[in-house]
Amino acid sequence: MQKRAIYPGTFDPITNGHIDIVTRATQMFDHVILAIAASPSKKPMFTLEERVELAQQATAHLGSVEVVGFSDLMANFARNQHATVLIRGLRAVADFEYEMQLAHMNRHLMPELESVFLMPSKEWSFISSSLVKEVARHQGDVTHFLPENVHQALMAKLA
């Protein structure tokens, strides 16, 4: 039986930190679903369709990754995808409390859903999509933090 895991997030846009996490997840699970949340309340820079396309391009080299957009409750989405593992990235201790609350709620809603926390590699531990966008808005060089296709799309959005 295939072990299916979901790595959810807004991914606005997907960064090399996200790619690091999903790449390592593919080494642990047979199939990884990169689940891109619609998240309209976060007012994303990129549309859901754009974020899905950018993530598909950025993960094309990872054969066991499927990129899917969603707007459902995570536990319902996981159940519909026949996934029993939820992958979450932890950059700092500050992330842990919120992630623990989410994990407990998801476990309440779907008892068979296990949360697995991965720390990004050291070089990506301080970046976030929000930080990358903010630096780029002020003409800072964010080339190192994004896949090439995502960097081009971000620069086009900010032009």
UniProtKB/Swiss-Prot annotation:
CDD domains: PPAT. It is an enzyme of class 2 (transferase). ATP binds at residues 10-11, 18, 89-91, 99, 124-130. One of its GO terms (molecular function) is ATP binding. Its EC number is 2.7.7.3. Its cofactor is Mg(2+). One of its GO terms (cellular component) is cytoplasm. Reversibly transfers an adenylyl group from ATP to 4'-phosphopantetheine, yielding dephospho-CoA (dPCoA) and pyrophosphate. Homohexamer. This is Phosphopantetheine adenylyltransferase. It comes from Escherichia coli O127:H6 (strain E2348/69 / EPEC).
